[in-house]
């Protein structure tokens, strides 16, 4: 498929693995759903009615200067050109001409939406997925309860005076820290409150709103505020599993660790962050809800407890 519209011009074709993708974006995730939606429309388009059997009065339908064209080559090597005109009156759809000098039809508005998309809309948006548990994880003795978790997170960026790091509590034998699921390890060793757990639970996967710019230049990164990121998250995920010893003690171990880095820049008008994720050479938009750590500071996640030691009794009280 070769598409030309008011904003972009690009080709969607099969790669060596017979997967459809935008030419030039071979190094980026593939927006499979969007591509299938486009090709589905192009392979089985149904018109609501025919307006004209010949190509006369094209300017009445906006087809003298089409908003978009799609040149499609099918598996049998046959070719068809679709030209998109104006929206039809009465919200009935849009005008489309099939091949030069061919008939003019009214088709659904969804078809117009597909042809007017920019190439970046066909870049995949699933950026981080949870590490997979072993298929035979029942062998751990947990009954198949191996779970993907956030193991460690380091936060930096211009929004913070110094890095903030926290992760899964590995000091459970220490009575001072044994009650915490997560511990702050930098800049101080402290227990965490509920907000740390909420951040950790949301960190095992990440989906973007959409891609904004493929293969950005240094100047474009600066435009999005990504030359000096506002907030940076260095993230380690892993599958957590529990095993029992001969003494009936539970031992926690981890496997299939994956590391990720997310850099946030400026916000768009809707409050989404421009972002770089891992080694993907593209700028994405991330909703603020998908990155709850974006502005998190030490005081936001530290435990509100004044005393970390497990004080269970009071020896005496003196009041003057």
Describe each PLM feature range.
Residues 1-320:
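Soluble, acidic/polar mature domains that operate outside membranes
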